[in-house]
Amino acid sequence: MKGTFPIDKFQEIQTPFYYYDTNVLRQTLKVINQEAGKHEGFEVHYAVKANANPKVLNIICQAGLGADCVSGGEIQAAINAGFPANKIVYAGVGKSDWEINLGLDKGIFCFNVESIPELEIINELAEKKNKIAQVCFRINPDVGAHTHANITTGLAENKFGIAMRDMESVIEEASKMKNIKFLGLHFHIGSQILDMGDFEALCNRINELQDQLEAHHIEVKNINVGGGLGIDYNHPNRMPIPDFKDYFDTYAKKLKLRDGQKLHFELGRAVVGQMGSLITKTLYIKQGTAKQFAIVDAGMTDLIRPALYQAYHKIENISSDEPVETYDVVGPICESSDVFAKAIDLNKTHRGDLIALRSAGAYGEIMASQYNCRQLPKGYITEDF
């Protein structure tokens, strides 16, 4: 089953471009709010790194989500889109001074701090501005997620977070700093996680840490468990909205929250992944010795995930209903890795046919580059047509 697209309108647009189905986005946001709203103290932040298209950000902001940012640029993008500063959290292992100052000036909710040297700099910069910086400490729980090695973030070998053994000393250090206010703990174990057992393992680790801190009379008002919930890349039409009920229920059942504690989530891919498709045009059908190639005008510069992560995206010829043939779908970039898929079945494809690479709403447009001096792809939402 193919997706539904305004194909006639697409003929007028220069390819390649991203198309964002805002009906899917709004329905996804509705389900998120419904399911998270069933649990007291659950607060959801959108991970801006997944897709920072201004029109997309504005819709997400209007739905009431907060923003999870990993750079000064993302903080500014969130502010520009209307996200309240007191609902913005800022993470990242390498925060520059200007980015920290921006967060302080805007009055963001908190900095997710990843090391003592970073904490010292935040305190120093806050002191110069006579401000109090609210912080959560990102703890590396050494929990492995069943996902691609490049997108695991919670193992001891990863660069992210503070080791569990150092947690108490870091909190003690923060208590001595006059311009730091400790708010809680932050975790994030990875991305594109579909096994709820991974989130259960995180809950168990957090429960252990909370008991440990409680024994030392350390109060934790906020727990941020990051995001990581994946999407179904194989069946974008059958499963356009992830199982948010199971996701939020897992934390509600397995995590032992204290009275009055807030539980924060940072969801990106699960919010925007299925609403987006990369639309590209077929340039040539090339007969090789043992295969045929569908050469399209989009490349790894427009969607790098297949080359970077060997990621799968369902590919559809949305112009043709002819019987299927087998193709390698490749782009124009001067790299052998510029391949979207090998030996896939598409309806018989001709020059000029429009091809849709589905489930491209997350880590697509935002990761595009101008390698080979190519233009960046534009992003359009349903309302643009």
Locate predicted features.
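Charged (often Lys/Glu-rich) extended helix/loop segments that serve as interaction or gating elements
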Residues: 4, 259-385
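Flexible loop/turn segments at secondary-structure boundaries
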Residues: 52-55, 76-77, 144-145, 190-195, ...
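A charged N-terminal "starter" segment
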Residues: 1-133, 175-181, 211, 215-218, ...
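Short acidic, glycine/serine/threonine-rich loops at helix termini
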Residues: 57, 80, 100-105, 122-125, ...
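Short beta-strand segments
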Residues: 47, 134-140, 186-188, 224-226, ...
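Active-site-proximal loop/turn and secondary-structure-junction residues that shape catalytic pockets
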Residues: 48-52, 73-74, 94-95, 115-117, ...
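Hydrophobic residues within beta-strands of alpha/beta enzymes
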Residues: 67-68, 88, 111, 185, ...
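Active-site loop/helix belt of alpha/beta enzymes
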Residues: 142-284, 346, 372
